[in-house]
Each structure stands twice: as C-alpha cells, then as structure tokens.
Amino acid sequence: FYWKNWNDYLQFVDERGLATFKETGCLIMQTQANNYLEKHIKICDELQIPYQQWNREKIKNKLPHYNLEQFYPPKLQEEKNFGLSNGNHLKSGIFFPTAGYVTDPALSAHNIQRAAENTGAAFLFNSTVTEIIQNNNRVEGVCLANGDKYTSSIVVNVAGPWSRKINQIANVTKDMMITTRPLKQEVVHINAPKSIDFENNGFVVSDSDVGVYCRPEKGNNILIGSEDPPCDAHQWVEDASDYDQNFTEQWRTLVLRYAQRVPELEISTKTRGVVDLYDTTEDWIPIYDCSSLKGYYMACGSSGNQYKNAPIAGKMMAKLIEYCEDNNNHDRNPCKFLLPYINKTINVGFYSRRRKINKDSSFSVLG
C-alpha cells in the first residue's frame, strides 16, 4: 500500500517532512441512497478487502455522540422539514478498518515534487500554457505566455480544473465523449464538540442519509464535505483562474446537516475551511487516456475522488504511455495494467475519453 510505505514509494526524503497516512478506519452508513452497500460488499468479498458490519448498537458504542435518526433525503436548510427525522433510524453500517486519510495533502504533493526533482524533473510555477506545439498530428512541446518554448515528444494534461482549457488549446476535444469541467466545492473546518476527542478517537464517516462525509483534523477539528446529493446545486465555473472563492450558504448547510447527526456540534458564525475546484467529468470517473494527437495524454477529470489513487495512477499512466509509444492502438486494443497489491489486471480503456457515461457511477465525489 503506497500511502503506508510513502517513503519507499518516494525514494527521497523531503526537507519539509513526509505526509502521513492515518489508518483510522472508515464507516459507511448503509442507506437507501447507496443501496445498503450491496455492490460494495460483493466487491470487497471478491478482492478480500477486510470489513465489519456494525449494527446500530455497535455504531452507538463507537460514536456515542451520534443521533442515528434518519433524515433522508438530504435537504437544504431552507427546505421544509429540514432537521426533522423521517421517523426511521439507521440500522447498520460497514466499517473498513484499513481505511483512513492522509494528514496533509499539500505536503504529499510537495513530497512528490521533491521525489520527481531528485530523478531529474523540473517544475515551473505561475506559468500559463498558451499553445500545445504540434506538427503532422504529433505533439512537439508547449509554449508559455512569456514566449518560452519547451520541446517534447510527450505532453500529459494533468492540469486539474484547467484541463478543459488545455484540451481546447490542444484541439483534441472532437472525439471526446467524456469531457471535464471545473466545479466549485466548499469543505467545512469546524471545532469538534469539547466533550469529544474526535482527533484521536474519530474516523472517516460517509453518511448519505444526511449527504455529508467527515474526517478528523488536527487540533480536535472536523472536516465536513458534501456527498453531492440532488439538493446541492452544482456551482460550475467557466474560468478556473477567475471564480468566487468565498464561502456561500452551502457552508452553513453542511454544518447543519452534520449537526443532525451530532447535536452537540457548536454552530460557529465564523466560516473556516477550503473553497476550491474539482475537475469533474460527466460521470465523475476520471480520464486516463491517450488522445487524437499523438504523444498527447490525459490524466484529468479526477472529480474529487482520485487523490487517494495518485500513486498507482501515475504508474498506470507510465504504462499507458509506453504502450502507446510502442505503436499500440489503445483505442482499439486497450492497454492492460496489473494492480500489484491485489494481483488483478484492469482494462485501462475503462477510463477512456471515448467511453459512454457509466450509469453505475454515483455521479458524485464518491465516484
């Protein structure tokens, strides 16, 4: 598991220290919205992923501060019956003991930067790409706004919420059935109730009954995000470099929805957290693919759910690029990739830019 053995994966020690994986476990409530995790359980059995079924008593034992009344469907705070139980109670959840979170995502990105630099990579910051240089349907490099040009026979679009713009610049969108688009997201950072040591005793919880997920944060704080229920309007952004980075009423809605589960939560008037962008596809599944322009590849559309997969996604992209540069036609005969920790081979074509929208998707950050 790459995050557990982060130093081994990097093969380099960052002067800022290394990000840490906290194996707290993760509880996913079994709800109407996720079909009581029937498909998830089958997949876990197939892949031998450890899990435990917790009944209501077990959940209350582990989360004594939780109110297990049902509030489904999730609502906005101004909607009728917001905060009122529908008369039922959550009965069970699935706990994944080997799950967890990475303590500092920004530090983990810096760790990868330093490891890449150690092997010869160079980084340019605050630079704007204005042209994807190409000749005879082959990429030849990139041109920046200041006029600098960098030649290369391979270019990978891993531009996050700017990926749509870069693909347009490269003129590779005509054959794409799946596209990307920046989506504004708000994540709440709030104090845990004083009676709860959530930092040390808490764990990741996914709760589609109230439409939020949460995890512990240092300083006995809680991070709360939306699971994108239908009531939460999507805030699409046209320009990833120019959008409103202020919190909206969504911040308070997320806090109040979580407070349905944790009545002791103090509702602060001071907004804290993160406002940023997802790079979202139509089915919230990423694009890991080649393109109609030879040598130009895509690792985009991460849709808020691919950070955890970054180490293996990088290895998969390397395999895909080698496969295509050896004159294999990935569109017709997709590359296969072995997942070493579970000894399973996957079809990389699953992530194709030319795929049909996956109807089995959650169409949310859950992927």
Language model features with spans:
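Mid-domain beta-loop-alpha active-site segment that forms a flexible
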Residues: 94-114, 160-162, 209, 246-257, ...
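Charged, glycine/proline-rich intrinsically disordered loops and linkers
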Residues: 61-92, 330-340
